[in-house]
From Swiss-Prot:
Its EC number is 5.1.1.3. This is Glutamate racemase. The gene is murI. Belongs to the aspartate/glutamate racemases family. PANTHER family: GLUTAMATE RACEMASE (PTHR21198:SF3). The lineage of its organism: Bacteria, Bacillati, Bacillota, Clostridia, Eubacteriales. It comes from Clostridium botulinum (strain Kyoto / Type A2). It is an enzyme of class 5 (isomerase).
Length: 257
């Protein structure tokens, strides 16, 4: 098999990275994708750094053994902790994801920018470096959201439980003063509609899925690795939990409008 026809690997701590996979498939409809969700060990955002590194390495090896030509680490926590190590250890294009703070700043709406993310993402040096670029001129507030990925892993993406969780998190803010909400975890786009409801649709909601997918396409094009055959690609999903329910949920989220 030529390298152009090999699949693209996607990895996340669970089902969250499917939000990025959806964007990538829209942008690269001829490509085949292999998605590995580590729901057995989710969430990563409250684990120790060394544990996240080991789990990420295991997932990467799983996908490498399936012959992928590129890897998207569709997990903010894993990106912040392991992306440099992965690029040193594997000789394929590796694309990570980080909170889309730059697009939020470039909107120039002038209000508060809230970054929803896991505690580990917000505690890592990679995030601190990102904050340093803008904190002098922008009103940016990190908002740790422990427990939210776990709800989404159970398939709870709407209804009273999600509404009340978000209502509690945003109760300290004046919705009129929020200009943007950055979704700093790939699980969060699945609760975007409820987030709009809680914040009365006042804020612009931004995630990094499109930017990451665009970077994937750019790197594949520059390396002459894009698939040339004119056909519709396919998506195959694996999960460390190895049960039908989590696979069914994964495909349901992938097909969610």
């Amino acid at each position: 098999m030529s390298i152009n026809d090999k699949p693209i690997g996607f990895f996340d701590s669970g089902v969250g990275g499917i939000s990025v996979l959806k964007e990538a498939f829209k942008l690269l409809p001829k490509e085949d994708f292999l998605y590995y969700g580590d729901s057995k060990n989710a969430p990563y955002g409250t684990k120790k750094v060394e544990e996240v590194k080991a789990l990420t390495s295991n997932a990467t090896d799983f996908l490498m053994n399936k012959g992928i030509k590129a890897l998207v680490v569709a997990c903010n926590t894993a990106t912040s902790v392991t992306i440099n190590d992965l690029r040193e250890n594997y000789d394929i294009p590796i694309i990570g994801i980080e909170p889309a703070l730059k697009p939020a700043v470039e909107l120039k709406k002038g209000g508060k920018i809230i970054i929803m993310a896991t505690p580990m993402t917000l505690a890592e040096k990679k995030f601190a470096n990102l904050m340093d670029l803008y904190k002098e001129t922008e009103d940016i507030e990190p908002l740790p959201c422990p427990g939210l990925p776990e709800l989404i892993e159970q398939g709870i993406v709407s209804g009273d439980i999600i509404y009340n969780y978000l209502k509690d998190k945003f109760s300290k803010y004046d919705n009129e003063k929020i200009s943007s909400i950055v979704l700093g975890c790939t699980h969060y786009p699945f609760i975007e509609e409820t987030l709009k409801e809680v914040t009365h649709n006042k804020a612009c909601i931004i995630d990094g899925s499109f930017g990451t997918s665009r970077e994937l396409k750019r790197q594949l094009k520059n390396s002459n690795m894009l698939r040339e055959e004119n056909r519709v690609g396919k998506v195959t999903i694996f999960n460390s939990r190895e049960d039908k329910d989590i696979i069914d949920l994964s495909y349901k989220l992938f097909n969610m409008k």
